[in-house]
Each structure stands twice: as C-alpha cells, then as structure tokens.
Design a protein with these regions (language model features):
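C-type cytochrome heme c attachment motif
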Residues: 62-69, 133
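Thiol/disulfide oxidoreductase modules built on the thioredoxin-like
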Residues: 103-110, 118-161
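A short beta-strand-turn-helix
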Residues: 30-55
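N-terminal targeting signals for export/organelle localization
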Residues: 1-38, 145-146, 157-160, 168
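Structural microenvironment flanking redox-active thiols in thiol-disulfide oxidoreductases
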Residues: 68-108, 118-125
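Hydrophobic beta-strand anchors of alpha/beta hydrolase catalytic cores
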Residues: 56-57, 87, 134
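A generic structural signal for alpha->beta connector loops
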Residues: 53, 84-85, 111-112
Length: 168
C-alpha cells in the first residue's frame, strides 16, 4: 500500500500525453461540489442537466504533480469559455482526502465545478486508468474523446472547437 502513490505517479509520467477519439454515450453522474469561486459547497453537478452545452470532465487528485500543474490552465480556459462549455473536476479519493481537494481549490481560487468521486464509480464508469485524464462530452451527451496526461490551454481550445463544430 505504501507504494501506491509512487506507482500512480509512474503510470502518469510514463503514459505521456495522448488524445483518443470516442463516440459512446457518456455515463451519467452526479457529484457534490466543493466550494469554488463560482460554485457553492454541496451544490450537485449532474451531467444530464448541463443545458445542451459540451462538458469537459477532468479526473485528478491533489498529490498528482501533472494534475496540479494543469489546474490553473483549466481554470483560465473555463473563465474564457464558461458561457459555451461546462467544466467539472472529479477528484479521486484514497491518496488524498476530500478535505485535501477542498483546501486545494480554495487556496488556488479555482472557479470551475470541482467535487469528489467518493466511491470511485465515476472513474470506473469512464475507464480512467491515468491521472490526469480529461474527457470531452459533446452537447448530445456523447464522449467525443479523452486526453491522458497534462493538458494545455491550446489543446482545450482545439477540443472546444471540435465540440462546437460537431454540434453544428
């Protein structure tokens, strides 16, 4: 058990970054959110109720260095695009507590929706094996693709254009 954090970090670093396209229905989920700049604590994020906008789902945890490195980029992307896309961060619990996640988003003044996956069901349903992983869900609720590893603002912008073009 003491080697689990090291193993997870190695999986993340050795996997590199990659994008994969998908076309299956995104498994629905509801998570209770942490308090962020734009969201109140205990608000529920329900993927099915996202108003026909595409949704970007980021799977992360606080002791994951690439997860932490990409969070400010995702937040900047969210601030620039929040009228046209939903963004939600889903924290893996186990290595870090929910309190660790809440403390991180508060300390970093994160704006987008962030919450925990207490039983790991969302991560399992999305087949998450590498952290961070970012999943792109189109406005019809289909998974358009996913990115494994740290993501850049440029890649987020490119994926948003693809999601928007797919809707037209």
């Amino acid at each position: 058990m003491k080697y689990l954090p090291i193993t997870l970090c190695l999986v993340v670093f050795l996997s590199g970054c990659s994008f994969t396209e998908n076309t299956k229905i995104a498994p629905p989920f509801k998570i209770e959110l942490y308090e962020t700049v734009d969201y109140k604590k205990n608000t529920v994020f329900d993927l099915r109720l996202q108003g026909g906008k595409p949704t970007i789902v980021n799977f992360w945890f606080p002791s994951c260095p690439p997860c932490i490195a990409e969070f400010p980029k995702i937040d900047q992307f969210y601030l620039e695009n929040k009228n046209s896309v939903n963004v939600v961060g889903i924290q893996l619990l186990g290595l870090d507590s929910a309190q660790d996640g809440q403390d991180f988003v508060k300390e970093k003044h994160i704006h987008f929706a962030v919450g925990a996956d207490p039983l790991g069901k969302v991560s399992v349903n999305y087949h998450i094996k590498v952290y961070p992983t970012t999943v792109f869900v189109d406005s019809q609720g289909q998974i358009a693709g996913h990115w494994q590893g740290e993501i850049t603002i440029e890649e987020l912008d490119q994926q948003l254009l693809i999601l928007q073009n797919k809707a037209n």
